[in-house]
Amino acid sequence: MEPAVSLAVCALLFLLWVRVKGLEFVLIHQRWVFVCLFLLPLSLIFDIYYYVRAWVVFKLSSAPRLHEQRVQDIQKQVREWKEQGSKTFMCTGRPGWLTVSLRVGKYKKTHKNIMINLMDILEVDTKKQIVRVEPLVSMGQVTALLNSIGWTLPVLPELDDLTVGGLIMGTGIESSSHKYGLFQHICTAYELILADGSFVRCTPSENSDLFYAVPWSCGTLGFLVAAEIRIIPAKKYVKLRFEPVRGLEAICEKFTHESQRLENHFVEGLLYSLDEAVIMTGVMTDDVEPSKLNSIGSYYKPWFFKHVENYLKTNREGLEYIPLRHYYHRHTRSIFWELQDIIPFGNNPIFRYLFGWMVPPKISLLKLTQGETLRKLYEQHHVVQDMLVPMKCLSQALHTFQNDIHVYPIWLCPFILPSQPGLVHPKGDEAELYVDIGAYGEPRVKHFEARSCMRQLEKFVRSVHGFQMLYADCYMNREEFWEMFDGSLYHKLRKQLGCQDAFPEVYDKICKAARH
């Protein structure tokens, strides 16, 4: 009884403090208090609910039976929109704060919201090596199910809450992408509802133009209702090697070399300064040396990027065996390294042991509670960007990142970009090795001004035929955007499928003016 009374007293004192100081003051200056007392428990409740729901739905096999009914309901909503005169554009009815991005789309308030309640795994076919899923299935759901039956996705993007729909309509990448490409390149079929309410299935051989135009289109060609994705046999562990490297030239040379070696299942780099990095390479295995087993995903373990940094500080190479699912979600607990700015003591051993089992807070709840003042502060003093550039331009790109934003650590993830139709492809006719440069944090460049600095960075990326991930703030104008992306097939299909009066153009959904 005494702990309950103490907790009640603490809660009462906190509420009185909030009343005196004001909620906005607390959310800005003591955000960690609000996050620890409210968002962490709420996030845990969300996770438990969705895990239990997904488990029950899959065990009862109810998702396939309900799927057709849900798709018909979406078709009905689209046809009703047409009957009512098609007065506004359509978009999904999913609230903007639920998406894994820093901003919320303004268009949700002005467009016709089509409710899409599709969040289940429909089928796992191990003979065809395919999993069929609905668009709101998360990576956490996928790994929980597939790994338990000995399978996995060839490319399984990092954060638990990333959804299949977001990874197709936007993009997704992981440290296996040097072998398999982006998330779109492991997809074998898409099912969509078009602007007229009709259903269509597209594959590389059936409705192929639409199949190649859907990725990166952000829901502006139709509503995704299901996807078929390749699966491969999984093993229990990842045998991961850590190698600290110093000197930018040596870093680029080592990273490029390891990215070209297809015997590596996983390749990743963490850059802690312009001339200090740790390059990691891994292979899946069922064998393990018990003394080198590291369950890095356990709640009491150090954050992964801090653990990796120790190899740099001690200037030693390392070899560890990490459980496969722990490896896939190695950056989840610390949201890469963003959580250190929200909970500064989050990696403290005492905090990890007492409260680490509730970490991380859900990104969607962080967005929902950030408030206008905090949003503006983040916009001017915080960067979250992923720029995709040819591997041959890595050194030049890292110098540009250093000069324009100066954010560390930097995430380096290689990927092969096939020469295929669509919004994103190499400049030549052959596949090319690219690298995702991820910068997340507070810029340390003097006199940082978000718009001018980011426009400078975007200009560089365009000049080397690179691409900007569309979840991030985009300061390009329309002409610059279509200089970066190949819109030829996309615009052809927009006209052919009657999308011009049904959905906004992709630029109008992702540009800075379209988000707040």
UniProtKB/Swiss-Prot annotation:
Residues 58-234 form the FAD-binding PCMH-type domain. One of its GO terms (cellular component) is Golgi membrane. Residues 1-22 form the signal peptide. GO terms for molecular function: Delta24(24-1) sterol reductase activity; Delta24-sterol reductase activity; enzyme binding; FAD binding; oxidoreductase activity; oxidoreductase activity, acting on the CH-CH group of donors, NAD or NADP as acceptor; peptide antigen binding. Its cofactor is FAD. The keyword Lipid metabolism applies. Keywords: Cholesterol biosynthesis, Cholesterol metabolism, Endoplasmic reticulum, FAD, Flavoprotein, Golgi apparatus, Lipid biosynthesis, Lipid metabolism, Membrane, NADP, Oxidoreductase, Signal, Steroid biosynthesis, Steroid metabolism, Sterol biosynthesis, Sterol metabolism, Transmembrane, Transmembrane helix. Pathway: Steroid biosynthesis; cholesterol biosynthesis. It is a single-pass membrane protein. The record marks 122-123, 383-384 as: Cleavage. Interacts with DHCR7; this interaction regulates DHCR7 activity. This is Delta(24)-sterol reductase. It comes from Rattus norvegicus. The lineage of its organism: Eukaryota, Metazoa, Chordata, Craniata, Vertebrata.
